[in-house]
């Protein structure tokens, strides 16, 4: 028996060689063949490939692959070492005894460094609790390090047991005594002893394995793995099927074969033998594997070179195989698109570009099928939602992008992405460890299983979000829940207080000024929402109960029971597999812990444990199902496909970021053959290049999707572009690198030859329509409307409509059209307010003022705000409440001094002439005076409604003495502004003028912004130049917004419109003596009668 080494540039050649080997049957017809594969995707592909050569019918191509057991190398190693069912030295199992050893050793002098890290000497309880929460994660990390030492440098652990520390750095001197204590605690043979015994046993006699074994597709093996395989080959035929990109490089490195694999990596000179730049920069793993393989081999054969196509990709592969660039005589054809690199604006555009490229390839080659294409991305969880949205919606998308008719299969996704119950479990742990913010609970309520449990519909969730925002819920279930943050005396902004407000709002209104304990009823909780309020309260109460159970220190089984109970209390699902998977994953965690799961764990420990359990893992069923396969870089990187697509090769993402573990002894002086994930990712790229038989497509983020700032490609991708420049006689980078525009409807995407090939790049009919529209005749920007709308019928006018219009005349125009303007969305806040900005102060002050005008005592009004939770907590909130209360109190006192008794409502019905009337109600009126008051600084928008009401009353009862008083804050701090108006000489004429402006304002946006027009009219009245004050009110500056910033004005005249848009000539009938601009004429008609009627208070 012996070791047989078979090499080839592509795995399909290796598969054919393996098929030829397996076609020679073993003496025992019932004996199974054993094939060890590196990944699940390779297993699926290899079984399909072998089924075409190992069938039982004529030609052996009947698609049957039987009698072959596919396993991964680790399961074989576990079997021959006797640890298939229970390996006490696996990182998952080792973490538990290591945790116990750490807990028992914290007072040992050698353990002081580790004890300090875990809070054993912390001076405060908070710091100690924080650091103790690291115990499991630290134990699991150290267990992983010890397992890595045992697999990659076993002599290190053997020396530590013998007391030989070698050249161990002083800051890591605590690891040898920790290892010795761990070996004593575990009680089983240490890994290096077990390894030596296994090798001796394998050399003494055959293992209980088939006489013939094959190891297929590996590019890296640890030194212990190589030693086991070498020993196994003594009594078994062991065939190693090794994909290697270059036989020339293999022969050049022949002198390194069988050399000591523990050579320091910095002393390794094998890269000098790599004459091709990609073999030098990407191929370190295969070079180091060649060094590590045993020198004694019965067979060392190269299975022949593949026929390379006469394309850029074929030339690159030929150069790699020949271990040298050979550009002479090569010229890239314009039709050669065998290598494509696409620079895009972010992940979403990468998927847009990918589907256009794939559709182009499928259209150009009718023999190409989706199963011939593989899409690999380093970060599949980022791209998975985008891929789902971009492909495979043909059943529901109708006539849209043809890529929606391509079905895709996603593999290697995290369990939290595929099982919503596990996603809920992860979110529960997050909420339990954090503050239970409003956003967290609302996001949890939107999870499908939670919605099913509590019957939350879309409208229900919108209503709940509104309640949460209006009841000022921020974070924390109740004051007790806030105790760990030192805020247990703050009752405001908790879920408990917010729910009390919602539930009391079912029975009473906020105006009743009746509260339950500290809860002020929340308005707008309608009687038809009583059940929803109850379901929300039940959801929060159950969640509070679950989170309460996910605290403290307890054994692992108690944590998993509490989490399972929480899932049962909060979720409902009809798919039994989801709940079964949860139970299976939890059972797997317990099984790995075994009998050593007794140490008490804290919440961060459990989170670290389950994060690793629920992470992405290789899957078998989603590979090579006939659809378009999307997976990570690992499982399919060496499987030949006609088209290989690499998506997301962004700088900083690929290769994976690797921050050396400061506690890793191997990282201080790495040896050849030891794992380096960045080198591993580089090898993945080299394998993927060799696996593409027809086309290689690569996308990356070449520009920021928000700023457009250029971004470089990943370093390995840049090295590939450099190598491609050396593949032909002239550089080809500019021809194969396509820089895509930001938008999919850019005209470049639909212009033949503008991006790729001679055809339009996009297949999207919507993008084509958009591009055609964008490429149409461009007109200079115009106003919102090109002319006035038809005049509305001369109907009667209600006072309410007139008042609404003059709140903002331009907005009144859009309101008449039922046109919705953009508005700021009120978001849910997660932070307790610690300051009161101007808008919040106005809201609070206006509410206090209204309460005081209704007769509420100022202190009670302040207490109501305290119960609403709108003010900062503690003394800060008390101080701000007093400040706002005092201002509101002074305003209320000033208003009440002029309000005699209860206000009356006066119905009005004024004949405007020409068959039109103005009708409505003016309220409240105190004797012969209207008294309006606002917490705001008195501005034109406040006095104009009072003026309109006064004119209407005077027109209704001209013989009575009427007046209007407006009260507000003055521009000088802490002073009160008062403005008194008396009726004009002809109130009916003023009303007619107001109604004419109202009619005109419904036909077009009038250049009549209130502050700007009032400033113009005041300047005219005072005999001053009106342009400077009006321009100042119109234009926004860095200190305050101007009228040009109002949404209605932006929509009508554009953002930051110049002051001149208001200065056109007056229309016919709008003329006013002395005014040459339309703004001046309209301002005179609106404001001069008001200013002339102003009296002294």
UniProtKB/Swiss-Prot annotation:
CC terms in the record's Gene Ontology section: exodeoxyribonuclease V complex
Keywords on record: ATP-binding, DNA damage, DNA repair, DNA-binding, Exonuclease, Helicase, Hydrolase, Nuclease, Nucleotide-binding
Pfam families referenced in this protein's UniProt entry, alphabetically: Exonuc_V_gamma, RecC_C
UniProt xrefs under InterPro entries: DExx_box_DNA_helicase_dom_sf, P-loop_NTPase, RecC, RecC_C, Restrct_endonuc-II-like
Domain of life the protein comes from: Bacteria
Molecular function terms from GO: ATP binding; DNA binding; DNA helicase activity; exodeoxyribonuclease V activity
Keyword Cytoplasm: no
Gene Ontology BP terms: double-strand break repair via homologous recombination
Function (record text): A helicase/nuclease that prepares dsDNA breaks (DSB) for recombinational DNA repair. Binds to DSBs and unwinds DNA via a highly rapid and processive ATP-dependent bidirectional helicase activity. Holoenzyme degrades any linearized DNA that is unable to undergo homologous recombination. In the holoenzyme this subunit recognizes the wild-type Chi sequence, and when added to isolated RecB increases its ATP-dependent helicase processivity. Unlike the case in E.coli, suppresses RecA-dependent homologous recombination, is instead required for single-strand annealing pathway repair of DSB.
Note, other: In the RecBCD complex, RecB has a slow 3'-5' helicase, an exonuclease activity and loads RecA onto ssDNA, RecD has a fast 5'-3' helicase activity, while RecC stimulates the ATPase and processivity of the RecB helicase and contributes to recognition of the Chi site.
NCBIfam families: recC
The family this protein is said to belong to: Belongs to the RecC family.
Subunit structure: Heterotrimer of RecB, RecC and RecD. All subunits contribute to DNA-binding.
Record-given protein name: RecBCD enzyme subunit RecC
Organism: Mycobacterium tuberculosis (strain CDC 1551 / Oshkosh)
High-level lineage: Bacteria, Bacillati, Actinomycetota, Actinomycetes, Mycobacteriales
Gene assigned in the entry: recC
């Amino acid at each position: 028996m012996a070791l047989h080494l078979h090499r080839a540039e592509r795995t399909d050649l290796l598969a054919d060689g393996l098929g030829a080997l397996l076609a020679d049957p073993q003496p025992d017809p019932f004996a199974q063949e054993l094939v060890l594969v590196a990944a699940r995707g390779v297993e699926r592909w290899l079984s399909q490939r072998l089924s075409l050569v190992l069938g039982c019918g004529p030609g052996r191509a009947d698609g049957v692959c039987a009698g072959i057991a596919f396993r991964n190398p680790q399961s074989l190693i576990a079997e021959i070492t006797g640890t298939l069912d229970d390996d006490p030295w696996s990182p998952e199992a080792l973490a538990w005894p290591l945790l116990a050893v750490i807990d028992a050793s914290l007072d040992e002098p050698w353990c002081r460094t580790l004890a300090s890290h875990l809070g054993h000497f912390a001076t405060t309880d908070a710091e100690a609790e924080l650091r103790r929460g690291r115990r499991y994660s630290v134990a699991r990390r150290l267990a992983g390090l010890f397992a890595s030492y045992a697999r990659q440098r076993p002599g290190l652990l053997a020396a530590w047991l013998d007391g030989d520390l070698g050249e161990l750095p002083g800051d890591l001197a605590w690891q040898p005594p920790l290892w010795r204590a761990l070996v004593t605690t575990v009680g089983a043979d240490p890994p290096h002893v077990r390894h030596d015994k296994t090798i001796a046993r394998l050399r003494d006699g055959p293992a209980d394995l088939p006489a013939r074994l094959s190891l297929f597709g590996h590019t890296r093996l640890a030194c212990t793995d190589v030693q086991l395989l070498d020993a196994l080959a003594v009594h078994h035929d062991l065939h190693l099927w090794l994909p290697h990109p270059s036989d020339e490089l293999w022969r050049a490195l022949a002198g390194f074969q069988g050399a000591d694999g523990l050579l320091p990596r910095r002393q390794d000179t094998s890269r000098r033998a790599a004459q091709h730049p990609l073999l030098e920069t990407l191929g370190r793993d295969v070079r180091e594997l060649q060094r590590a393989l045993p020198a004694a081999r019965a067979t060392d054969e190269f299975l022949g070179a593949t026929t390379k196509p006469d394309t850029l990709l074929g030339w690159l592969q030929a150069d790699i195989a020949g271990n040298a660039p050979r550009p002479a005589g090569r010229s890239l054809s314009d039709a050669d698109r065998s290598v494509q690199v696409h620079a895009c604006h972010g992940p979403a555009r990468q998927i847009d570009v990918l589907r256009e490229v794939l559709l182009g390839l499928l259209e150009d080659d009718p023999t190409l099928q989706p199963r011939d294409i593989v899409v690999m991305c380093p970060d599949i969880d980022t791209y998975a939602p985008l891929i789902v949205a971009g492909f495979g919606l043909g059943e529901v998308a109708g006539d849209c992008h043809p890529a929606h008719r391509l079905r895709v299969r996603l593999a290697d996704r995290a369990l939290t992405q595929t099982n919503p119950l596990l996603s809920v479990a992860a979110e529960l742990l997050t909420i339990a460890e954090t503050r239970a913010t409003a956003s967290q609970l609302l996001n949890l309520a939107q999870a499908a299983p939670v919605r099913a449990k509590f019957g939350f519909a879309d409208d229900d969730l919108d209503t709940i979000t509104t309640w949460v925002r209006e009841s000022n819920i921020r974070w924390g279930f109740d004051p007790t829940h806030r105790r760990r943050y030192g805020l247990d005396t703050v009752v405001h902004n908790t879920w408990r207080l917010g729910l009390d407000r919602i539930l009391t709002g079912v029975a009473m209104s906020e105006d009743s000024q009746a509260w339950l304990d500290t809860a002020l009823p929340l308005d707008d909780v309608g009687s038809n929402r009583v059940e929803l309020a109850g379901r929300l309260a039940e959801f929060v109460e159950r969640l509070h109960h679950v989170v309460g159970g996910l605290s403290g220190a307890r054994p692992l089984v108690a944590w998993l029971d509490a989490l399972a109970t929480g899932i049962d209390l909060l979720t409902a699902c009809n798919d039994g597999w989801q709940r079964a998977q949860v139970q299976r994953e939890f059972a797997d965690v317990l099984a790995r812990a075994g009998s050593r799961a007794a140490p008490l764990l804290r919440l961060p420990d459990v989170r670290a444990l389950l994060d690793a359990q629920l992470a992405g893992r290789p899957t078998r069923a989603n590979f090579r199902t006939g659809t378009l396969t999307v997976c990570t870089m690992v499982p399919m990187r060496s499987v030949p496909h006609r088209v290989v697509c690499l998506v997301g090769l962004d700088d900083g993402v690929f290769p994976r970021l690797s921050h050396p573990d400061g506690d890793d002894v191997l990282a201080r002086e790495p040896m050849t053959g030891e794992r380096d994930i960045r080198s591993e990712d580089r090898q993945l790229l080299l394998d993927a290049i060799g696996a593409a038989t027809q086309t290689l497509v690569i996308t990356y983020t070449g520009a920021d999707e928000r700023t457009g700032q250029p971004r470089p490609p990943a370093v390995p991708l840049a090295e590939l572009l450099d190598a491609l420049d050396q593949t032909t006689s002239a550089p080809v980078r500019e021809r194969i690198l396509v820089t895509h525009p930001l938008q999919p409807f850019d005209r470049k995407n639909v212009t033949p030859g503008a991006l790729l090939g001679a055809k339009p790049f996009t297949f999207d009919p919507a993008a084509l329509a958009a591009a055609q529209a964008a490429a149409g005749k461009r007109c200079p920007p115009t106003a919102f409307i090109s002319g006035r709308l038809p005049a509305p019928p001369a109907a009667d006018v209600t006072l309410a409509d007139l008042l609404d219009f003059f709140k903002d005349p331009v907005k009144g125009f859009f309101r008449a059209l039922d046109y919705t303007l953009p508005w700021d969305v009120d978001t849910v806040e997660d932070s307790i307010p610690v300051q009161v900005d101007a808008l919040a102060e106005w809201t609070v002050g206006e509410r206090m003022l209204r309460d005081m005008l209704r007769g509420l005592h100022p202190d009670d009004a302040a207490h109501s705000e305290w119960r609403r939770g709108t003010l900062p907590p503690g003394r800060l909130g008390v101080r701000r409440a007093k400040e706002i209360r005092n201002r509101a109190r002074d305003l209320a006192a000033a208003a009440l001094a002029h309000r005699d008794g209860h206000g009356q409502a006066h119905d009005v019905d004024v004949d405007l002439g020409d068959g039109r009337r103005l009708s409505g109600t003016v309220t409240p009126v105190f004797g012969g005076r209207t008294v309006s008051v606002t917490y705001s600084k008195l501005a034109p928008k406040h006095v104009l409604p009072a003026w309109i009401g006064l004119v209407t009353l005077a027109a209704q009862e001209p013989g009575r003495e009427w007046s209007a008083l407006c009260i507000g804050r003055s521009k000088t701090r802490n002073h009160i502004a008062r403005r008194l108006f008396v009726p004009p000489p002809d109130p009916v004429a003023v009303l007619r003028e107001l109604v004419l402006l109202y009619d005109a304002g419904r036909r077009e946006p009038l250049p009549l912004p209130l502050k700007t027009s009032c400033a113009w009219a005041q300047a005219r009245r005072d005999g001053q130049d009106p342009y400077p004050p009006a321009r100042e009110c119109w234009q926004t500056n860095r200190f305050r917004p101007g009228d040009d910033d109002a949404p209605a004005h932006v929509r009508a005249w554009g953002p930051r419109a110049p002051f001149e848009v208001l200065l056109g000539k007056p229309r016919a009938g709008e003329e006013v003596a002395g005014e040459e601009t339309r703004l001046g004429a309209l301002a005179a008609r609106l404001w001069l009668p008001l200013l002339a009627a102003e009296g002294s208070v």
